[in-house]
């Protein structure tokens, strides 16, 4: 579990308090571009199976990984090398899966990054070269072809009695390692209307986006369909030029509405609360009970000429201490900053604060959803 110095915690608390105060003072606005995506404009995932060669004995064990051996034989036969019946002994080849994201509106001949991951028992892909690997989409068509030298973020070194590993040496990346061979057709300029898909579904935010667009255009061209979708009808002056229309729309400022939510990460003790968190009237008390037990055995030694026996007498000390905390009353409609200040005034740490927030929620006095990660 990570530990932080008291000084670092104080600095973080001060920075968080300043941020919270500034957030309460003025509501932030965001561009529509940062709140929603254009429906249909997205990346597409690609995947392929290939071979990495040139490894320094750290590749797959062919006797243990049959698909690597079969792939190597098939590749050599396509190259005109007949090895049927021959015994292949090499540790310089590894079977890999190649993945990448085809960007929206990617044109034929442009390049994209790919990630290469070992599929067998290869120990290290350092220094390897990926051979030509077709990348397929969900429809089974080839959209790109990848090949190139791998860049590995981790490493592994071992001797006869010790081994050290840093990072993940069985995963590599090839920057601009794939060439796009097929384009995905998407006639944006011929669409009569466009839909905006909100990244965080919310009725109020969807309505505000539609209102901002209508105010900008002077017509009712935008309509919220549901909490996550706003439909835009392209005006006559932008017909056939949806790019110019969307460029103007994306820059409009909207104040998004946020649901009152508290995010709790119990593993690290991190608590994140939104600005709209409110609590009803509730009394909070917190105390810690500590039980300490110490053992100090006493040895009884008889006189040298006596016939007595040395004995050990147990001696236990039990102490009970309780940190007394005052009962604090949290008034109705308290804001986030007031809640944090009040709980800090009780000397409550992050771990105890998690339990208190859950208890307040169970009592029905907190107006927010609590999400535990």
UniProtKB/Swiss-Prot annotation:
Belongs to the FlgI family. Residues 1-27 form the signal peptide. Pfam families: FlgI (PF02119). This is Flagellar P-ring protein. The basal body constitutes a major portion of the flagellar organelle and consists of four rings (L,P,S, and M) mounted on a central rod. Its main location: periplasm. It comes from the Bacteria. One of its GO terms (cellular component) is bacterial-type flagellum basal body, distal rod, P ring. One of its GO terms (biological process) is bacterial-type flagellum-dependent cell motility. It comes from Rhodopseudomonas palustris (strain BisB5). It is found in: Periplasm; Bacterial flagellum basal body. Keywords: Bacterial flagellum, Periplasm, Signal. Assembles around the rod to form the L-ring and probably protects the motor/basal body from shearing forces during rotation. GO terms for molecular function: structural molecule activity.
